[in-house]
A protein has these predicted regions:
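Short cysteine clusters
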Residues: 18, 55, 103
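Short acidic alpha-helix initiation/capping motifs at coil-to-helix transition points
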Residues: 14-20
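Transmembrane alpha-helix interface/packing and boundary motifs in multi-pass membrane proteins
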Residues: 44-51
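Amphipathic alpha-helical interface segments
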Residues: 24-29, 64, 77-115
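DPxDG-like acidic metal-binding loop motif
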Residues: 60-68
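Polybasic, low-complexity association/targeting segments
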Residues: 1-12
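Acidic-glycine-rich active-site phosphate/pyrophosphate-binding loop
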Residues: 26-43, 100
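Conserved phosphate/anionic-ligand binding catalytic regions in large, soluble enzymes, centered on
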Residues: 52-60
């Protein structure tokens, strides 16, 4: 996981948004081309379309989890995926101060005030 974190950071430094950076970092393990990973996650950046709503990085996490664990042929899958995403949100909140997955709140907490 540290390797993907470093890769995500490198993508971010190249100018890709948070969501793109996360998904592209996992592209090799997901069997995706870099281009496909970057394209499929482009709209989730900056809190989904720069609306500062759900964190783009967290949207990237959900995309990766869905690609790895979702099974559309399994009728029980929806509940299992929701539980997995909820646990990921709990861990994400804990790692980022404990109370949010909302972009504007995370940025404010970090002292970042984007345009």
């Amino acid at each position: 996981m540290a390797k993907q974190g470093e890769a995500a950071y490198a993508y971010f430094l190249k100018g890709y948004n948070c969501s793109q950076s996360v998904v592209a970092a996992f592209a090799p393990q997901l069997g995706l081309s870099e281009e496909m990973a970057l394209r499929m996650s482009a709209g989730f950046g900056a809190g989904i379309g720069r609306m500062r709503e759900v964190c783009g990085a967290f949207c990237g996490v959900v995309t990766v989890l869905s690609l790895v664990y979702a099974d559309p042929a399994d009728p029980q899958d929806k509940s299992r995926m929701y539980a997995l995403v909820q646990e990921a949100a709990r861990l994400y909140r804990a790692r980022n101060g404990g109370d949010s997955i909302i972009c504007r709140e995370l940025l404010a907490k970090a002292g970042v005030h984007p345009e």
